Each structure stands twice: as structure tokens, then as C-alpha cells.
From Swiss-Prot:
Membrane topology: Multi-pass membrane protein
Localization (cell): Membrane
Residues making up the signal peptide according to the UniProt record: none
A GO biological-process term: vesicle-mediated transport
UniProt keywords, alphabetically: Membrane, Transmembrane, Transmembrane helix
Transmembrane domains' residue ranges: 9-29, 61-81, 114-134
Name the UniProt record assigns to this protein: Protein cornichon homolog 1
CC annotations in GO: membrane
Membership in a protein family: Belongs to the cornichon family.
Main location: membrane
């Protein structure tokens, strides 16, 4: 059970990083729309977070697959496949010259991903709490055997 608790702690921090990353991207796009940032700064800030987000999402999905958590894997695999498709088609970076033309689509995409990552974060927090309670109650039961 200790490995299960470790899995959920790692998943907690990875999903928290994903939520923070996408939230930062939404803030950058909102600042661009309000004319607080120029297109170059916005695209630079967002583009440097895209590949780490893809890697974190893919590794989290792979972690769920390798630990046989099928429900979490099936929840996470559509976004992972979408990220792989974007990477394969080379459409994952925001172009400086066309950022204003596609800002509404990019914001909708980021809001959708933010909603998905918040949902995944809530699921992981629930399982982390459940695993911690089970882990600590089993340890207490083992102490009474001696």
C-alpha cells in the first residue's frame, strides 16, 4: 500500500503542475487580449510550456497504465492522444504573427484543458486521501498484532 500512496503523491504534484501551467497560459492569453503583453512575449511564454506539458501529461498517462489504474488511464488517454496528434502535425506552438487571429480558439482550448486538468486533479486528490487513510489504518492494525 505504500507504493500506492507514493503513486498518488506523485500524481498529485504532476496534476497540480499541469493545472498551474494551463492556468498560466490562460492568463498570458488574457493579458494579450487586454493589451498588457505583446504577441512576441505571449507566444514565447506559452511555447516554452507546451512541450513540458505534453511530457507531464504523457508520463502521467503512462504511469496510470503501468500501475493498472484503468479508469484514470482511460480518462487521461484522450488528451494524451490529442497532444501526440498536435506534436506530429507540428501545430502545438503559437505563431507570433497569427496569435491575434486565433486567440479565441486558443483561449477555448486552454479553458477546456484547464477544466479537464481540474477534474483530473480532483480525482487524484480523492484517491490520494483514500489511499492515505487506507495506508495509515493498515499500519495501525499491524501494530496491534505484536
Amino acid at each position: 500500500m505504500a507504493w500506492d500512496l507514493f503513486l498518488w503523491i506523485v500524481s498529485f504534484f504532476v496534476s497540480l503542475a499541469l493545472v498551474a501551467s494551463v492556468f498560466y497560459q490562460v492568463i498570458c492569453l488574457t493579458d494579450l487580449e487586454a493589451d498588457y503583453l505583446n504577441p512576441f512575449e505571449t507566444s514565447t511564454r506559452i511555447n516554452r510550456l507546451v512541450i513540458p506539458e505534453f511530457i507531464l501529461q504523457g508520463s502521467l498517462c503512462l504511469l496510470f497504465l503501468l500501475t493498472w489504474h484503468w479508469v484514470f488511464f482511460l480518462v487521461a488517454v484522450p488528451v494524451t492522444v490529442y497532444h501526440a496528434m498536435l506534436y506530429k502535425e507540428r501545430r502545438y506552438l503559437i505563431d507570433v504573427t497569427e496569435v491575434f487571429r486565433g486567440i479565441s480558439f486558443e483561449k477555448k482550448l486552454r479553458y477546456t484543458k484547464l477544466g479537464f486538468y481540474v477534474f483530473l486533479f480532483i480525482m487524484v486528490v480523492f484517491r490520494l486521501t483514500l489511499s492515505a487513510v487506507y495506508s495509515f489504518t493498515e499500519d495501525d492494525d499491524l501494530l496491534h498484532l505484536f
